[in-house]
């Protein structure tokens, strides 16, 4: 039995962003249809970070698990804070099929899921994007959100003006802004991409009709102002995952009723309503979901087989 190994360079080459958006939508529909099995993530904590396991199965899609380590201090060592491996298995036999880099997958699928929310919830005429956070996720959001809306202005703000400026230089539409409030006032879409344990944007800074995405994970609190979650029309990947007690669930939503949120899959299936008013505040809060990793890894593996890329080893 041969197992295919794919490094990060392979994954970067093979993971098509536009196909990923389509695959993520299929994954969200599967979640809301109940055709998935995804247990709560488990983690082993160390003094410096943690290692989490995220297994998931989706009928007619596949079976996979991701191992992801999150070590916040890695930036000081020149290493990513998030590093991951994804293992794909044959859903009929349980035999291992592929092992691939999951670090790039995690970065792109997270931003891709946010882009799905922008595609279906932001106002069609949205032209101003504010990105809060200029790290890996800030860069991924700049790429992926631009695929679903024609932004004319992109504002980037971060803890340091230097990091915001560095990211802004990668896109002619982007410019660095000093201060989070200045970045988000008047923006049509606000993307929160930080590791902050405290809210980085206040509800009163947001204009009517804003769409907010938040992908940060920093229990026991987080980057999203609770008032934004409570006052906006809230969307999540999975209520079962988002409303588990932290740290398995979303810290910013702790204590809220699960019925306060709509799953993106319900919206895509036509079972729930989306934006109904141009002045409505819409909010997407991400926890990260194993099905996002699964659909991404399946795309990569299919492309690797077509292009005969990767290194096989006998299992």
Question: What is each PLM-predicted segment?
Answer:
Residues 1-105, 115, 125, 262, ...:
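N-terminal ligand-binding/catalytic initiation module
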Residues 133-135:
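Glycine-rich Rossmann-fold phosphate-binding loop(s) that bind the pyrophosphate
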Residues 218, 222-315:
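Adenosine-phosphate binding glycine-rich loop
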Residues 121-128, 150, 207-208:
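Short helix-loop-beta connector
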Residues 138-139:
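N-terminal Rossmann-fold NAD(P) dinucleotide-binding loop
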Residues 129-130, 282:
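Conserved beta-strand elements of the Class I
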Residues 147-170:
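NAD(P)-binding Rossmann-fold cofactor-contacting core
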Residues 172-255:
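Rossmann-like adenosine-cofactor binding region
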């Amino acid at each position: 039995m041969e197992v295919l190994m794919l490094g990060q360079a392979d994954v970067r080459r093979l993971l098509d962003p536009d196909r990923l958006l389509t695959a993520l939508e299929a994954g969200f529909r599967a979640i809301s249809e109940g055709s998935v099995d995804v247990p709560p993530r488990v983690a082993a904590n160390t003094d410096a970070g943690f290692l989490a396991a995220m297994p998931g199965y989706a009928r007619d899609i596949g079976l996979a698990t991701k191992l992801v380590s999150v070590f916040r201090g890695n930036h000081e060592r020149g290493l990513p804070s998030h590093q991951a491996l994804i293992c794909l298995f044959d859903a009929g036999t349980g035999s291992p099929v592929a092992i691939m880099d999951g670090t790039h997958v995690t970065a792109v699928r997270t931003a891709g899921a946010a882009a799905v929310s922008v595609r279906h919830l932001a106002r069609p005429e949205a032209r101003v994007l504010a990105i809060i956070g200029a790290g890996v996720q800030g860069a991924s959001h700049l790429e992926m959100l631009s695929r679903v809306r024609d932004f004319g202005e992109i504002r980037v703000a971060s803890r340091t003006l230097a990091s915001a400026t560095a990211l802004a230089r990668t896109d002619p539409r982007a410019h660095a802004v000093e201060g989070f409030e200045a970045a988000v006032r008047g923006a049509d879409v606000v993307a929160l991409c930080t590791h902050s344990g405290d809210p980085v944007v206040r509800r009163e800074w947001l204009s009517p009709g804003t769409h907010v995405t938040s992908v940060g994970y920093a229990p026991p609190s987080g980057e999203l102002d609770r008032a934004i979650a409570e006052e906006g029309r809230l969307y999540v990947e999975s209520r079962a995952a988002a409303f588990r007690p932290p740290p398995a669930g979303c810290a910013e939503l702790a204590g809220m009723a699960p019925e306060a949120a709509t799953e993106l899959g319900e919206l895509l299936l036509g079972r729930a309503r989306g934006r109904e008013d141009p002045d409505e505040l819409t909010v997407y809060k991400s926890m990260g979901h194993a099905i996002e990793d699964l659909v991404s890894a399946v795309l990569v593996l299919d492309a690797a087989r077509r292009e005969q890329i990767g290194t096989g080893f006998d299992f």
